[in-house]
Amino acid sequence: MEKSVLRKEMKLLRKSMDKNDRTAKDKKIFENLIKLDSFKSSSWFYVYVSYGTEADTKNLIEYLFELKKEREIHVAVPKVLGDEMEFFEINLFSELEKGCMGILEPSTGNKVKPENAFMVLPGLAFDEEHKRLGYGGGFYDKYLSKCGAERFMKVAVCYDFQMQKKGVIASDSNDIKVDMIVTDKAYY
């Protein structure tokens, strides 16, 4: 399937979700994510700030802020700078402001150097081979290529209907696969 067609289809499906259904699925994704051993053992978390109909990460970020009271962890979120993306450490939601395309980004803060980290990635579609179809800007692929994808436990979160059969998502040589996909129903 053509990437543009699949992107459009996934956006429409996410947009058509019932609010209560979305809330229940977001809760299940969160619960599934925090059960992971790799999550429990991490001290650095690179997390996208959900926007629009994306699987929610704001509750996850709030949870991480609470977790900071119990153990030393660091939370970093992305900021688009031109045609690239960098991650900045944050300690409070109030450190975010609307940035590129209206997405919440750090207003200030310390740009982080790539650490061995647990990274939560967004996307429109994924498959059983761990291919990821993003929004087309290549921000995550460029960042991971530049920093070394092996430094991160790359975990995508999505609704189960965003999972595709093997071979549906075309990939280019610069596309970086995720290590795991967590949905409201399963782990892939």
Ranges and model annotations:
Residues 45, 119-120:
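Receiver (REC) domain switch-region micro-motif
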Residues 12, 110, 114-119, 128-131, ...:
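Surface-exposed, charge/polar-rich loops and edge strands
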Residues 1-112:
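N-terminal active-site beta-alpha-beta segment that forms phosphate/nucleotide-binding
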Residues 100, 132-136:
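Short glycine/serine/threonine-biased micro-segments
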Residues 84, 121-123, 136:
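A short beta-strand-loop-alpha-helix capping motif that often carries His-Thr
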Residues 52, 82, 125-126, 162:
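Short, solvent-exposed loop/turn segments at secondary-structure junctions
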